[in-house]
């Protein structure tokens, strides 16, 4: 407690001893932040011969600095690392964060790859679930090109037992095809049907489905986008012969 005396004024300023700072850890991520606080209250006592004593409290602005440890700064930009409180700030992507012209393109060869495992990998990249900035309600994903769609494989007896149904909308307009029949007629539709079932149903799902490009044969017209090989982590995606 510091006391400053003058002829008619006494100012009391409460201050805490400057310490090295108190560490607090995020309950979700477990990282540590250092918070340093400064004195925040000033009490003034003004003496007047006619009116007696008058007490006034003045609040000083508090400055809290959150510092990210040096071994954790690689995860953040310079502005985020030196910002006030990055742990309690909700981040939401802006329009400039998901521009279609800035999104990557991937290409994958469907030869002898299991249909379901291939479709789930493609759907994850189209939705952007492989990104740290994944947001369920925003189109954050990449574009995926599938070539050799006629060579996709299925396990077990699905080639003859798996059925695809479509209806023309008229009475008796139901058409049923097996996997083998549809693969011989329109092989691209098999991959499109599998991936579309793994995307959201609604306006966002329809927009995400446009990121899928399926072609019969090894060629595709997207060389200008310079597509990269689709990273596949599933070791069982290839058909075991």
Curated annotation (Swiss-Prot):
**Predominant place of localization:** plastid
What are the transmembrane regions? none
Subcellular localization, as worded in the UniProt entry:
Plastid, Chloroplast
Q: Which keywords does this Swiss-Prot/TrEMBL entry list?
A: Chloroplast, Plastid, Ribonucleoprotein, Ribosomal protein, Transit peptide
What does the record list as GO biological process?
Answer: translation
Where along the sequence do coiled-coil regions lie?
Answer: none
Example GO molecular function? mRNA binding
The protein, known as: Large ribosomal subunit protein uL13c
